[in-house]
Regions:
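N-terminal catalytic cores of NTP/NDP-binding nucleotidyl/phosphoryl-transfer enzymes
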Residues: 1-55
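Receiver (REC) domain switch/active-site residues of two-component response regulators
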Residues: 31, 65, 96
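Short, solvent-exposed amphipathic alpha-helices that sit
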Residues: 54-58, 189
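Short, contiguous strand/loop micro-motifs
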Residues: 8, 42-43, 59, 73-74, ...
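Non-catalytic positions within long, well-ordered alpha-helices that form the structural scaffold/packing
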Residues: 25-26, 60, 87-91
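A broad structural signal for alpha-helix termini and local helix breaks/kinks
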Residues: 28, 63, 194-197
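A glycine-rich helix N-cap at a beta->alpha junction
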Residues: 57-71
Length: 427
């Protein structure tokens, strides 16, 4: 039995995700597809537009056999930690291969970049320092240093974006690899695989359609998640029917999941953020909240802002939108740096929580129970009896975050979904 794993957000599930899932099965010849999906919050430091149970159902309807949850401590982490959790979890449950999308589409090129970043040469470190001293952001300086140190004889074959048969001795081509979000995440998967000595095979496919951050329908066949979220937000403000909106832009196979769907947006958390800022102290040890950002947050005079407005007010050249958004979300959730450090030190993947699975895929569950090296949670009410204290704390952080999400969601007309009583999603 061969199992392929996909590390995802599905925010929301769109045509590009369906293509990814289909190609992953074909490329690996896998018998089963396991999806590891962010829960209530995503890496950008925002709430998922739809709840985790709805998004689980869309994945299963599209062909996934099993959906597991990335807990909020790592679903809202940096690319490095997000990737490390995904690789650790899929390795721990016995997945054989991982397939991810990338702008590059060439696994060997991404492996070379990953190796270079895991084994930084003295020249790389010096060029990185020079870039930072010159005023570049860390991602910009890192991309430039990679380009300047990796340029040389490797060739990229049959990659449209990199021009087939282009000699990548050109440093700009190497730099561009680290300027593309899916390449960056793919490189982090490969770095984590080396660090964790993962036995899994890794494959990449060229990302189809609009770019990750494209917020318009540049490609009607493969619109980006960002564009779809924008359409939903803008259309709802004009009192358009949600199901009509979704039917035009999401795979038909997933449409049944959206009956009664209630979208959630980052500004729905504005009240919680304002209340937290009012009572916070600059000495809080909150994940991703630097002393500089904490000081700016607490500097008088206080004025209530929407979540989006506060991000815009705080971001700088060095503090990107996503970095600020992630820090503010961690502040609202009370997510402490010391807790995340402990969970990382203990191996990231302390349990595997099932969100849903296909009934016809029961042999997969039997296989995972045999191959799995960490507790497998199928019933939340029983989790406390099977988890070590640290693992239970990781799960309880997810429960707290999801209940906050649900509290906000019911204000938009949703039904509260309790983490301890909500059943698994079956298809």
């Amino acid at each position: 039995m061969k199992i392929v794993g996909l590390i995802t957000e599905y925010n929301p599930f769109h045509a590009g995700h369906l293509y990814h899932m289909q190609q992953a099965r074909e490329l690996t010849g896998a018998d089963y597809c396991v999806v590891l999906m962010s829960g209530s919050f995503v890496q950008r430091g925002e709430p998922a537009i739809f709840d985790k149970y709805l998004r689980t159902k869309t994945a299963l309807l599209a062909g996934a056999d099993l959906v597991l949850e990335i807990p909020v401590a790592f679903s809202t982490a940096s690319a490095h930690e997000f990737a490390a959790y995904g690789v650790a979890l899929l390795s721990a449950i016995g997945v054989d291969a991982v397939v991810f999308g990338s702008e590059c589409g060439q696994i060997e090129i991404l492996k070379q970049a990953a190796y270079a970043l895991n084994h930084e040469s003295a020249e790389f470190q010096e060029r990185l320092r020079k870039g930072l001293k010159a005023g570049l952001t860390y991602p910009q300086a890192r991309a430039k240093a990679l380009g300047e140190t990796q340029a040389g004889g490797t060739r990229v074959e049959n990659v449209e974006d990199f021009h087939a048969n282009t000699d990548v001795s050109n440093s700009h081509i190497w730099s561009s690899i680290l300027n593309s979000p899916n390449n960056i995440l793919g490189i982090e998967y490969l770095r984590a695989a080396e660090d964790l000595h993962s036995p899994m095979e890794f494959y990449t496919i060229s990302r189809e359609g609009s770019g990750y951050h494209e917020d318009t329908l540049a490609d009607a066949n493969f619109p980006s998640a960002s564009a779809i979220r924008g359409i939903i937000r803008n259309s709802l403000s004009k009192d358009k029917d949600l199901l009509d909106i979704l039917a035009s832009h999401l795979p038909a196979v997933t449409h049944p999941a959206y009956t009664g769907a209630v979208p959630v947006f980052v500004d729905d958390f504005s009240g919680l953020l304002n209340a937290t800022v009012l009572q916070m102290q600059a000495t809080f040890s909150i994940a991703d909240l630097s002393p500089e950002l904490a000081a700016r947050l607490t500097k008088p005079p206080y004025f209530p802002l929407s979540f989006e407005e506060r991000i815009q007010a705080l971001k700088t050249r060095q503090l990107t939108y996503t970095r600020v958004s992630r820090a503010l979300l961690h502040l609202v959730l009370g997510m402490r740096e010391e807790d995340i450090s402990r969970w990382k030190d203990e191996g990231y993947a302390l349990y595997a929580r099932i969100l849903g699975f296909r009934r016809q895929s029961s042999p997969l569950l039997s296989c995972l129970h045999k191959k799995n090296s960490i507790p497998l949670i199928t019933k939340m009410a029983d989790a406390a009896q099977s988890l070590a204290p640290s693992a239970l704390a990781l799960l309880e952080q997810e429960v707290y975050a999801s209940h906050l999400y649900q509290t906000v969601r019911i204000k938009r007309g949703g039904v509260f979904q309790n983490e301890y009583t909500e059943g698994l999603v079956f298809v």
